[in-house]
């Protein structure tokens, strides 16, 4: 499978009105996707698809989306707050598997994946991008913090296939889906789900999220929800208003009665699915501000080549990488 290919339609036309948005990459989301799908083996016989696929995808996105700068947001160990609230949170996740194997070996060990992730982070330190993470926070929470607290005056494109990002979309924030290979807007979320993007988190709190092992109200899906609680598709709202609406209509609507009866489940789910910027410690927030306020570092192509040599690969177009990323050296996003 090639690196995340961009469809023939020119994405530059889609993002033209953004006037060079900041591109924020959900680092682990893209890395795991490339790790599972991209076939690349080093001269040492080890898998390198995660690292090489990530760099090639980042290069392609940079050329097609033409951002003013690139931020990579990494997982910081997951959310202790969510696990304390619901111990089964994300416990259904299976280890990532390669979708291919060579001879009789299936080289999908955690050790190899971790090695690639560390090597990728080291390589990116030689590239004009900003890398950020926060202890005990998930990557999407960090992205929400950057979008809503750090880059409040910037247009943003979030690179992620995670539907949780839908709740961040508005006039200045869009999402590039690695899965759909296109830029998504708040209007696209409404067209697909019949729900305003800013209400997407509330809808997930009611319907649940099987991906994260979060159970919803029984027999309530998105279509049923929007039919019986129309305010989700009409206006930006808050969870309390949705629950009040369900309570006031429980006699005439069985779905509303179910939501009303499961109020505590819905409230717990809301704490699980909302992108929480309040859990970020002040010291870590200040550190992220410091990182994003700095000029982008210079491109150290010698350092990049050294890491590639150490990993036993020359499977990157260094000339293209230089042309793509040299323009970001010294740029600012804050």
Where do the protein language model's features map onto the residues?
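Non-catalytic nucleic-acid-binding/docking modules located in mid-to-C-terminal regions
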Residues: 2-8, 12-19, 60, 64-74, ...
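Noncatalytic, basic helical substrate-engagement surface that gates or grips nucleic-acid strands
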Residues: 2-9, 13-159, 165-183, 274, ...
């Amino acid at each position: 499978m090639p690196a995340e290919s961009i469809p023939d339609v020119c994405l530059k036309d889609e993002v033209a009105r953004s006037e060079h948005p900041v591109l924020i990459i959900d680092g682990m989301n893209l890395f795991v996707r490339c790790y599972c799908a991209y076939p690349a083996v080093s001269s040492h016989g080890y898998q390198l698809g995660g690292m090489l696929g990530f760099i090639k995808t980042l290069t392609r996105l940079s050329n097609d989306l033409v951002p003013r700068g690139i931020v990579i947001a990494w997982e910081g160990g997951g959310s202790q707050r969510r696990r304390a609230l619901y111990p089964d949170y994300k416990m259904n996740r299976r280890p990532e598997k390669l979708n291919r194997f060579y001879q009789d070996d299936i080289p999908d060990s955690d050790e190899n994946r971790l090695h690639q992730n560390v090597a990728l982070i080291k390589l990116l330190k030689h590239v004009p991008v900003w890398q950020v993470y926060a202890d005990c926070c998930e990557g999407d929470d960090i992205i929400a913090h950057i979008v809503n607290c750090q880059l409040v005056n910037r247009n943003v494109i979030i690179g992620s296939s995670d539907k949780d990002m839908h709740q961040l979309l508005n006039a200045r924030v869009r999402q590039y889906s690695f899965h759909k290979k296109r830029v998504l807007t708040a209007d696209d979320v409404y067209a697909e789900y019949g729900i305003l993007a800013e209400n997407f988190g509330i809808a997930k709190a009611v319907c649940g999220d099987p991906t994260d092992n979060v159970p919803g109200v029984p027999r309530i899906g998105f279509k049923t929800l929007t039919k019986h609680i129309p305010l989700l598709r009409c206006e930006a709202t808050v969870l309390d208003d949705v629950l009040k609406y369900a309570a006031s209509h429980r006699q005439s609507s069985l779905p509303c009665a179910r939501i009303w009866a499961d109020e505590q489940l819905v409230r717990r789910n809301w704490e699980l699915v909302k992108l929480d910027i309040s859990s970020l410690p002040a010291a870590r927030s200040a550190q992220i501000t410091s990182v994003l306020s700095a000029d982008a570092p210079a491109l150290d192509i010698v350092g990049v080549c050294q890491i590639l040599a150490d990993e036993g690969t020359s499977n990157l177009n260094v000339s293209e990488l230089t042309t793509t990323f040299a323009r970001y050296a010294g740029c600012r996003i804050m």
